[in-house]
């Protein structure tokens, strides 16, 4: 498929989770399929007929084992990214050129020992909590702009 044909592919509908601990640090995981030292927040696709909040809660639990959370907000707008050329046609069965995501801000109500990244279909090798300002510095290139927007919004939002 030529690059022009990829431009006609739709964006995949997805959700992202900004999970905050009691210190307002953000949960990030190191992806299993990426050998470089890059991290991401939990995220994933929306199943047919699924509500966005349900999808976010499901994805969070599938990727981290976490289910003790409270949704405290949303990032204002839908955020989009395009896949880099080397990933086009290789992920999501080649059906999408990127993602359009609704991001939810959640407070983690559990304890660190409850976090389990060794799930049925693991996505992360490791995890840690980071300051929101660190997000753009640890993301893959094609997600840096999204992580900058999220970090900026977190810095201007009162989180309770």
Predicted regions located by residue number:
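Acidic, metal-coordinating catalytic segment for phosphate/diphosphate chemistry
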Residues: 1-20, 93-94
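A short gly/proline-enriched turn/hairpin at secondary-structure junctions
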Residues: 40-41
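Unchanged
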Residues: 47-141
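Charged phosphate-binding loop/patch that engages nucleotide di/tri-phosphates or the phosphate backbone
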Residues: 132-160
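A conserved beta-turn-beta hairpin within the catalytic core of GNAT-like acetyltransferases
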Residues: 34-37
């Amino acid at each position: 498929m030529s690059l022009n044909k990829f431009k006609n592919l739709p964006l995949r509908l997805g959700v992202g989770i900004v999970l905050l601990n009691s210190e307002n640090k953000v949960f990030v995981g190191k992806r299993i399929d990426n050998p470089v030292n890059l991290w991401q927040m939990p995220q994933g696709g929306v199943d047919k007929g699924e509500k966005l909040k349900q999808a976010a809660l499901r994805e969070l639990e599938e990727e981290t084992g976490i289910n003790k959370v409270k949704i405290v907000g949303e990032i204002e707008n839908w955020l989009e990214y395009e896949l880099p050329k080397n990933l086009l046609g290789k992920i999501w069965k080649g059906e999408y050129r990127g993602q359009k995501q609704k991001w939810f801000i959640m407070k983690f109500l559990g304890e660190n020992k409850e976090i389990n990244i060794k799930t049925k279909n693991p996505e992360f090798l490791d995890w840690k909590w980071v300051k929101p300002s660190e997000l753009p510095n640890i993301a893959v290139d094609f997600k840096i702009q999204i992580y900058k927007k999220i970090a900026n919004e977190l810095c201007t939002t009162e989180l309770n």
